[in-house]
From Swiss-Prot:
UniProt organism field: Synechococcus sp. (strain JA-3-3Ab) (Cyanobacteria bacterium Yellowstone A-Prime)
EC number, UniProt record: 6.3.3.1
Places the protein is found: Cytoplasm
GO BP terms: 'de novo' IMP biosynthetic process; adenine biosynthetic process
UniProt keywords, alphabetically: ATP-binding, Cytoplasm, Ligase, Nucleotide-binding, Purine biosynthesis
Protein name, as recorded: Phosphoribosylformylglycinamidine cyclo-ligase
Family matches, as InterPro entries: PurM-like_C_dom, PurM-like_C_sf, PurM-like_N, PurM-like_N_sf, PurM_cligase
Gene: purM
Length: 351
């Protein structure tokens, strides 16, 4: 008896890590500037030299996963997008305090190492890191036979960023009357998929079903990768736009995430129907007979990221990010009431 007969192929794992190292080195060669990495992939730990120019640097850490969106990717056989999702979920969180992503680590757990699928995941992770301007510094691939069924895997990601202490964004910067501007999502991103899967299953739709008016089947629309907002925010930072706060709209939707960048005595007042709801959300609401407030509490509904800025910065923000749109303002919180006001005035998602 040996380890391979127990379900763990050491040689295949070694070849997989070698391939990752080659891909990372190729990705670094294509990127501009110094990576700051010391050594390479495959050691016990990854090393990265802190960039110069910081007077009082603060390191910022975040971790996340992709959730049950992975189930659709594994059924549909498309895995690259969830690699991008993994990076996006972590770097977008780190970004909310004003940090620049520095490096990323991944964890892949699977019942049986299947390189064809996992290469797609790694390529997606590298693509996400390149877009976010950070390095893939290391990771872990765990082959766990008997724990995960064949063909199944789970992902976790870890990101560390850096920000000048004086530039850290927290709720103390947010003022009453500040305006809320949204950056559009690319779709469902990586949240709400347990409800998505239940709706699709109970309605009996196959993943290759293409609803009327759609240009792609359900699986491809729902697997659209999470948008990475690093470059958009860095454009604002470089232009000196006074960012008072930022919120990444993930699990729990706007009601759960927007208050996280506000002070306890503050609330967000949303203007009803201030943006069009993308069709995939309207389809899910109709197919699942989901109430409007439940939709807000589950999905991003087209708002992937929220910027809190003073009113005098609105015109400059609009010129720098034409895709951004205003959704409301910061108002006093009402004792015993929701920290996100105006949702009850929406009624239907369609005006």
């Amino acid at each position: 008896m040996d380890y391979r007969s127990a379900g763990v192929d050491i040689e295949l794992g070694r070849a997989f890590v070698k391939g990752i190292r080659e891909r990372v080195e190729g990705s670094q060669a294509q990127s501009s500037g110094s990576s700051g990495t010391l050594g390479g992939i495959g050691g016990f730990a990854g090393l990265l030299e802190l960039p110069a120019g910081y007077r009082a640097p603060v390191l910022v850490a975040g971790t996340d996963g992709v959730g049950t969106k992975l189930e659709i990717a594994q059924q549909w056989g498309q895995h690259r997008g969830v690699g991008i999702d993994l990076v996006a979920m972590c770097v977008n969180d780190v970004l909310t305090v004003g940090a620049r992503p520095l490096f990323f680590l991944d964890y892949i757990a699977t019942g049986k190492l299947e390189p064809e699928a996992l290469w797609q995941v790694i390529d997606g992770i590298l693509e996400g890191c390149q877009e976010a301007g950070c390095q893939l510094l290391g990771g872990e691939t765990a082959e766990m036979p008997g724990f995960y069924p064949p063909g199944k895997y789970d992902l976790a990601g870890f990101c560390v960023g850096i920000v000048e202490r004086a530039d850290v964004l927290d709720s103390s910067r947010v003022q009453l009357g500040d305006r809320l501007w949204a950056l559009p999502s690319s779709g469902l991103h990586s949240n709400g998929f347990s409800l998505v899967r239940r709706i699709v299953a109970e309605r009996g739709w196959p993943w290759d079903h293409q609803p009327p008016g759609w240009d792609r089947p359900l699986a491809e629309v729902f697997l659209t990768p999470t948008r990475i907002y690093v470059q958009a925010v860095q454009r604002l930072q470089a232009a000196g736009i006074p960012l008072h706060g930022m919120a990444h709209i993930t699990g729990g939707g706007i009601p759960e995430n927007l208050p996280r960048c506000l002070a306890p005595e503050q609330a967000a007042r949303l203007e009803p129907h201030s943006w069009p709801i993308p069709p995939e959300f309207l389809w899910l609401q109709e197919q699942g007979q989901v109430e409007t407030l439940e939709m807000f509490n589950t999905f991003n509904l087209g708002v992937g990221y929220v910027l809190v800025i003073p009113p005098e910065a609105e015109n400059r923000l609009r010129s720098l990010l034409p895709e951004a749109f205003p959704i409301g303002e910061v108002v006093p919180a009402r004792p015993g009431e929701s920290r996100v006001l105006g949702l009850e005035e929406w009624g239907s998602l369609v005006p």
